[in-house]
Amino acid sequence: MTIMRKNHPLLKIINHSFIDLPTPSNISSWWNFGSLLGICLMIQILTGLFLAMHYTSDTATAFSSVAHICRDVNYGWLIRYLHANGASMFFICLFIHVGRGIYYGSYMLSETWNIGIILFLTTMATAFVGYVLPWGQMSFWGATVITNLLSAIPYIGNTLVEWIWGGFSVDKATLTRFFAFHFILPFIIAALVLVHLLFIHETGSXNPSGLNSDSDKIPFHPYYTIKDLLGILLLLMXLTILVLFFPDILGDPDNFTPANPLNTPAHIKPXWYFLFAYAILRSIPNKLGGVLALILSILILAAFPLLNCSKQHGLAYRPITQTLFWIFIANLLILTWIGGQPVEYPFTTIGQMASILYFTIIIILMPIANMIENNILKMH
């Protein structure tokens, strides 16, 4: 008699995904971040559900309801800060996951990669609408500035902005619909995650060597379940330290002030995980140009499979592209720093240089490095 998990209609799906899944024997800890993202999503949905039980999406009471959650609800402060800092951990894992995909050439599994880009965009949208909900100063002005960017779209821009706002400014209607979006989007993300997993299990994972690993596979359980468990413990430890010791370190001080349409904060900036894109947006003096650069800064990820002309899979044995990759990461950190700085010299100039380098590395330098490395291989 075969084991139940292998022939039960429901259990065999779980079995083929998490138990008997053939996995390359040499995947490193950089492959842990997929499961960590799954844990982050579960934490966000659970804490978000409990927050939604006490939150009111009305301009008159939203700010007070968040204060009420922190002061009067049992462990409300913990749930609120787990949710806020959980988003930061989510994005840290997301950036590392995408970075690993770029480094090890996972983008050649194009369906998985493209679903991943859609997931990235959906997560960014979820985080943006969620940032507006506490209805602090930066929530309000962040929503105003970012949604107002859509007015740069020719002909339909202004109508589109008013349609999203539900009026002539960010107000009660905007907050209500943003709450609705923030509630539904994580479930859409969860559905997309299943599609993402479906495609990755069609082809199997890539591995650090970039070679075909069909001849050297091991079952996912117990080897990688234990390995993932260690990653999860480390993630939870870091999140706990963040929540209990530095809960507001990644937030904005302006969000302790209730939203006031008559008073603009000195420097409007989004949450830290959007700063790199915000810096690219600000580095172009033209509104429409800035919006296009902002969109392109994420969609450029879709160009990786098209621009890749290397004979090797991944960067493990490609020192020139490796160097470019780490310059790209350093440049991304510089953009993140610039996004949080005021719009003045020398920050504007640094931002413009970093923005140009961001696109130049991906579109021009990496393909050139690929060709040079191909020629070096031919010589030997």
Curated annotation (Swiss-Prot):
Binding-site positions, a ubiquinone: 201
Binding-site residues, heme b b566: 97, 196
GO BP annotations listed: mitochondrial electron transport, ubiquinol to cytochrome c
GO molecular function terms attached to this record: metal ion binding; ubiquinol-cytochrome-c reductase activity
Keywords of this entry: Electron transport, Heme, Iron, Membrane, Metal-binding, Mitochondrion, Mitochondrion inner membrane, Respiratory chain, Transmembrane, Transmembrane helix, Transport, Ubiquinone
Main location: mitochondrion
Membrane topology value: Multi-pass membrane protein
Residue stretches spanning the membrane: 33-53, 77-98, 113-133, 178-198, 226-246, 288-308, 320-340, 347-367
Cofactor(s) required for function per UniProt: heme b
Residue numbers binding heme b b562: 83, 182
Free-text cofactor note: Binds 2 heme b groups non-covalently.
InterPro entries, A to Z: Cyt_b/b6_C, Cyt_b/b6_C_sf, Cyt_b/b6_N, Cytb/b6-like_sf, Cytochrome_b, Cytochrome_b_C_euk/bac, Cytochrome_b_N_euk/bac, Di-haem_cyt_TM
Location(s) in or outside the cell: Mitochondrion inner membrane
Top-level taxon of origin: Eukaryota
SUPFAM superfamilies per record: a domain/subunit of cytochrome bc1 complex (Ubiquinol-cytochrome c reductase), Transmembrane di-heme cytochromes
GO CC aspect terms: mitochondrial inner membrane; respiratory chain complex III
Quaternary structure note: The cytochrome bc1 complex contains 11 subunits: 3 respiratory subunits (MT-CYB, CYC1 and UQCRFS1), 2 core proteins (UQCRC1 and UQCRC2) and 6 low-molecular weight proteins (UQCRH/QCR6, UQCRB/QCR7, UQCRQ/QCR8, UQCR10/QCR9, UQCR11/QCR10 and a cleavage product of UQCRFS1). This cytochrome bc1 complex then forms a dimer.
Family: Belongs to the cytochrome b family.
Note from the entry: Heme 1 (or BL or b562) is low-potential and absorbs at about 562 nm, and heme 2 (or BH or b566) is high-potential and absorbs at about 566 nm.
Stated role: Component of the ubiquinol-cytochrome c reductase complex (complex III or cytochrome b-c1 complex) that is part of the mitochondrial respiratory chain. The b-c1 complex mediates electron transfer from ubiquinol to cytochrome c. Contributes to the generation of a proton gradient across the mitochondrial membrane that is then used for ATP synthesis.
Protein known as: Cytochrome b
Organism: Blarinomys breviceps (Brazilian shrew mouse)
